[in-house]
Amino acid sequence: LQNDCSRLFKISPTDTLNTVQTLYERKLVTYPRTDARVLSTAVAKEIGKNIGGLQKYEPLAQYAQYIMQQGGYKGVAKSKYVNDKQITDHYAIIPTGQGLGNLNGLNDIQRKVYDIIARRFLSIFFPAAEYEKVSLVLTRQIHTAVGEKEDGTESFFANFKRLKNPGYLTIAGLPSDKKQEEQKLTDEELAKFASLKKGDAIPVQAFNIKEGETSPPKRY
């Protein structure tokens, strides 16, 4: 949560904790001072109350209603989101589904942080996102001049993906990573690439050189 708030709202971890503490005091979310990312079995058994309460939270009401109607939340106790052994002090922060009248007294950042907590919570009851991936390996013949080294080949590689079924991203939020945007393909373009077979020849209209820098791997 702190990472999301820092990235989206440019607030510090301390500010995030203080904000969630305010939400807790207003009965909007559960105990904030926890590092747990899972729920307890006991909480999972009563999770329908939390979801049911969010049916009155207008921005996400339709999603909460859908989850309640489908009844998928009933099996959450057996999912990866519930693990008593991974909880040391308190389970993950989730919306209580109560105190929604207190939202009117919150500032903009506090309301946004609550919205993130509610979205991340409801998203666990949606299926995984599905992507369609295409990988290309293009080989180009190199013809050298008379008297120079023999002819050869050089290869070019490209990977593309398209969001086929947003799944939980429908509610959690669609990715906005710049790298993904650069490789975004239309359905028509993806269909053309997907129809290629090994050995197919493609006419090359031009070559462009683009300078760039690779990113070092994360230390942690």
Positions of predicted regions on the chain:
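Core catalytic DNA strand-manipulation module of type IA topoisomerases
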Residues: 2-220
